Every structure is written in structure tokens, then in C-alpha cells.
Amino acid sequence: MNTFFRCLRSELIKLQRQPTLWVHLLVPLAGIVIFLGYYAYTPFTPASKVSAYLQVLAVSFPTIIGIVCAIAADQEAAAGNYQQLLTLPNRLIALAGKLTVLLLLGLGSTILASVGFGVGFLYLLSQSPYGLGFYLEAACLLVGSSLFLYALHLYVSLRFGKGASIGLGILESLVSALLLTGLGDYNWIYIPCAWAARFVSLWMQYGGANAVSLPIPADTLLEPGILACVTGTLAIMVLLGVWFRRWEGTKSLE
């Protein structure tokens, strides 16, 4: 356990030399300003504005995750060709430390994006139909359903490089947006990049502050969707650990 906390401390020190922290801070603030400015003059209902904002937030997740994982992996490559990760007696602790820091940054950034928007929507525009607790719950739901993507993009960044991770993230965001339409009604549970957007949409419509019974299609897919998300996340975490123990610090193109 002491080794794990030392790894966490080391990862936090590394943040001072890379733009990861600024990405997690400035991107949410920019999104809040843009959407609050836009919503100040649009005639849509307050509930639809919140729903659209959270969906855009969910759709942008894969791209942002791809970028921050690429930055983290690139920093390790520049600092001795991943030796800081590979030379520890227990590699998995080093991997867990890096992944934990990325997840904590993602959680903090998402809370800032969601709750910050809620504060502005509630107190500046006086339009929010929900309390701040709703936005905090939404942030936790978004991050929880995106754990799979963090593990996937960390693997892609280490194995194939930053270009592959960022490119995959952009593609996943496009697919996620597409699966918010009727095309994804019965297919989203099999596509990890669609989980966050679909879960937050279902929660907005039928849960949280609008607790009503789900229609048959949504009800029959919600439980399999949760099961797919949980099992898929656990599986990729295990596979990432197994691969990392055998990895020698080389990319596939080398």
C-alpha cells in the first residue's frame, strides 16, 4: 500500500510538467461559458437544455480521454522510454497509480463541468429545474460508465502511440453521437463509447428527478446495459494488467 501511495505522489509531481491538469481545468470552464452564453438566448425548455448539455458532455468524453491518456503516455515515453513505469518491482502498482490519477482528474473535471454548469444555470440564468445534487450525480454516472474507455485508451496510448489514442477517441465520439439516435436503441449496450451518453439520457428521462416507470424497450435494455458496462470494465482492467506485466516498453510500430 505504501508503494501505491508513493506512485500516486510521483504521478502528482509529474502533473507539474505536463498540460494534463490544464486540460482538465480549462476545457470544462470553456464548455460552461459557451453553453451558458448560448442558453441565455435560446427558447428551449430548461430540462431539454440540461439534457443536451449532459449529452454533449458524454459524447465529448472519448475524445478528451484519448487526449489525456495520450499526454500521460507520451510523458512517460519522453522520461526514459517508460522506465519509470517498468522498473518498479511491481509493475501493476505503477499502472494502478497512473490510472488512478487519470480517473481522479477525470472525476474532478467532470464534477467541475457538470456542477459548474448547474451553478450557472441555477443562479445566473435562474432556469435550472434541478438542484446541484442532480448535477453531482450526473457527473458520477458519466465517469463511472467511462472507466472502460480510460483503460482502453491507456493501453492504446502505450502500445500504439498518442496518434492512435486521439484518433480512436474522435471516432468513438462520432459513434457515440450517432448511437444517441434511433440507430442505437438496441445496439448501444454492445458499444462502450455509447454507455455514458445512453446511461445519462435514460437517467435524465426516467430516473433522478423524473423517477417514473421505464417504457418496455428502455426497461429491457437497462439491466443488460449495466451488466455489460460492469463486466466489460472489469474484464478490460484485468486484460490491461495482464498485458502490462508482459510489456517491454515498445510500441507496435517500432
List each language-model region with its residue ranges.
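Aromatic- and glycine-rich beta-strand/loop motifs that create alpha-glucan
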Residues: M1-L25, G249-L253
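Secretory targeting signals
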Residues: L21, G31-I64, C69-A70, L99-K162, ...
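Helix-loop-helix units of permease transmembrane domains in multi-pass membrane transporters
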Residues: A70-L104
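Terminal transmembrane helical anchor/hairpin motif
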Residues: I166, E172-K251
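Cytoplasmic juxtamembrane interface segments
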Residues: M1-N2, A72-Q83, L149-A177
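Transmembrane alpha-helical core residues of multi-pass small-molecule transporters
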Residues: V27-G31, V101, G169-S176
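Hydrophobic/aromatic residues in alpha-helical transmembrane segments
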Residues: I65-C69, A78, L149-H153, P192, ...
